[in-house]
Amino acid sequence: EALKRDVKTATIEREGDKLIVRFKSAILFDVDKTALKDDATTELADLARVLKDYPDTVLVVEGHTDSSGSAAHNKKLSEQRAQSVIQVLVSDGVDRSRLTAKGWGEDKPLQSNSTAEGRTQNRRVEVHIAPNQELKKADAENAQKSS
């Protein structure tokens, strides 16, 4: 709920025991750029504020592109964008040891790249939030105690 309330330009989805915070690339970056837009740092600061309240989570920041350009260029661009997001989260107080960057390039599209709308959907950064091993262990122990 805190994510939905505080991170207004992202969509939030639950997938099993993790949450996915999805930012459209246009919100964070100019076309074919890795430097964050000024407004993006505000959005990421809001995300960092929530993440600091949940230190027992691990975070994978994933960059994604559409299929425009070469696959090698898109992979590098997506990796650099994921790193840019991590740098801001760390500067806003999120522990670096919790963060991993992954650049998928055009390998994991949400929609077909054959339309402009599909390509827009595919250009994105996702922050996957999952419980760390200690939290998973504590949850398993609590589940055993209550059964």
Stretch-by-stretch model annotation:
Residues E1-K18:
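N-terminal targeting leaders that direct proteins to extracytoplasmic destinations
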Residues L19-K24, L28-D30:
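Short, aliphatic-rich beta-strand segments
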Residues T11, K18-I20, V58-V60, R98-T100, ...:
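Residues at or immediately flanking beta-strands
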Residues A26-L28, A35, K76, P109:
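Residue-level preference for alpha-helix termini and adjacent loops
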Residues E15-K18, P55-D56, Q80-V85:
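Short low-complexity stretches enriched in small and charged residues
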Residues H64-A138:
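Periplasmic OmpA-like peptidoglycan-binding domain that tethers envelope proteins to the cell wall
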Residues K4-D6, L28-G63, V90-S91, T120, ...:
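Periplasmic peptidoglycan-binding/anchoring modules of Gram-negative envelope and division proteins
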Residues T11-I12, L19, L51, E117:
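Short secondary-structure boundary/capping segments
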